[in-house]
Amino acid sequence: MKKIIFAVLILVLIFVCYWFISPLFIDKKVSEDLPVVETVNEETVSSETTQTEPVSQTLEIKVGTFTGFDRLHTGSGTAKVISIDGKNYLRFEEDFSVTNGPDLYVGLGENGEYIKGSELEKLKGNMGSQNYELPEGTNPEDVKEVWVWCRAFSVPFAKAILY
């Protein structure tokens, strides 16, 4: 019985160590285009005639550059707040890079402080271009800082102050 308990504990320990340590060695590159709006040709409406076209009304509202917090939690690249046909997004450009880690989320901050509960979405990847829709009712002018935050340990990885 002791051998079974010991084996189970070893397996759990291996899994936990892998979950904590593997992100430091594994990069996930994302390459998202700007969001698109779906349009439907009303003359020939059918389930097969839906077309997607790139949106022409893109407005850049704010921009900032990511910085890390220490040697273990580094970040770089461009963050933007953009508006496309009335919807507001955070856009991480192609040059975005952050140290990978467990349970990373994109959130908001103000005056150098992370706003708890402001998570927009789980970080899609630690490198490359990606989009995150701001919640409806959020004034894009009020977005001051974008944070990459480790929710499991309440640790900041990177932030961008937006101007």
Predicted regions located by residue number:
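Hydrophobic membrane-insertion alpha-helices, especially the h-region
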Residues: I5-W19
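Transition segment at domain starts
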Residues: I21-D85
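Exposed aromatic-hydrophobic patches
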Residues: R91-E94, S129-G137
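A short beta-turn/strand-edge loop motif at beta-sheet boundaries
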Residues: F96-N100
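Beta-strand signatures of extracellular beta-sandwich domains
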Residues: Y105-G107
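Surface-exposed loop/edge segments in extracytoplasmic proteins
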Residues: E113-L120
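Short proline/glycine- and polar residue-rich coil/turn motifs
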Residues: K122-G128
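Short, exposed beta-strand-loop hairpins at the edges of beta-sheets
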Residues: P135-I161
